[in-house]
Amino acid sequence: MAHDLP
């Protein structure tokens, strides 16, 4: 998975 967390 490739998630960009703020």
Swiss-Prot record:
Secreted as UniProt keyword: no
Superkingdom, taxonomy of origin: Bacteria
Keywords annotated in UniProt: Activator, Amino-acid biosynthesis, Aromatic amino acid biosynthesis, DNA-binding, Transcription, Transcription regulation, Tryptophan biosynthesis
Transmembrane segments annotated in the record for this chain: none
GO molecular function, one term: DNA binding
One of the protein's GO biological processes: L-tryptophan biosynthetic process
Similarity comment text for this entry: Belongs to the LysR transcriptional regulatory family.
Function: Activates the expression of the trpBA genes encoding the two tryptophan synthase subunits. In the absence of the inducer (indoleglycerol phosphate), TrpI binds upstream of the trpAB operon, overlapping its own promoter region.
UniProt protein name: HTH-type transcriptional regulator TrpI
Source species: Pseudomonas putida
Recorded name of the encoding gene: trpI
